[in-house]
Amino acid sequence: MLSNPKRTRFRKQHRGRMKGISYRGNNICFGRYALQALEPAWITSRQIEAGRRAMTRYARRGGKIWVRIFPDKPVTIRPTETRMGSGKGSPEYWVAVVKPGRILYEMAGVSESIARAAISIAACKMPIRTQFVIAE
């Protein structure tokens, strides 16, 4: 199930910049194993959902999964073959802004080998380089 905010204060946003590293959401809080971003990127709600589904399918009802990012930024696209001007395009999809160091998914209640395999499958769905981390 694709996620997006129930309501926002403004319909459209500036694109913004992704400079620096993530100072929030870079520690494992809930689970034992996690997937951590190593590069900055926009991750779409479809990519987040694909990774989550891949992990749950591999774990087969075992363990618990937490998704630590939420797509709260609307990306606008103007219709094809439209002339320039006449305002900004309409919101097309939602993205989560991810900086290096950010934890994307967490997992607990499974063995390390299963967690490593499940998280590596989810990592293949991501548009960035990631690493597998274990809570101390």
Curated annotation (Swiss-Prot):
Gene Ontology annotations for the cellular component aspect, listed alphabetically: chloroplast; mitochondrial large ribosomal subunit
InterPro entries per the UniProt record, alphabetical: Ribosomal_uL16, Ribosomal_uL16_bact-type, Ribosomal_uL16_CS, Ribosomal_uL16_dom, Ribosomal_uL16_sf
Main location: plastid
Disulfide bonds: none
PROSITE patterns xref list: RIBOSOMAL_L16_1, RIBOSOMAL_L16_2
CDD domains for the chain: Ribosomal_L16_L10e (cd01433)
Compartments it resides in: Plastid, Chloroplast
A GO MF term: structural constituent of ribosome
Keywords annotated in UniProt: Chloroplast, Plastid, Ribonucleoprotein, Ribosomal protein
One GO process term, biological-process aspect: mitochondrial translation
TM spans (from-to): none
Family statement drawn from the similarity comment of this UniProt entry: Belongs to the universal ribosomal protein uL16 family.
Oligomeric form and interacting partners: Part of the 50S ribosomal subunit.
Name the record gives this protein: Large ribosomal subunit protein uL16c
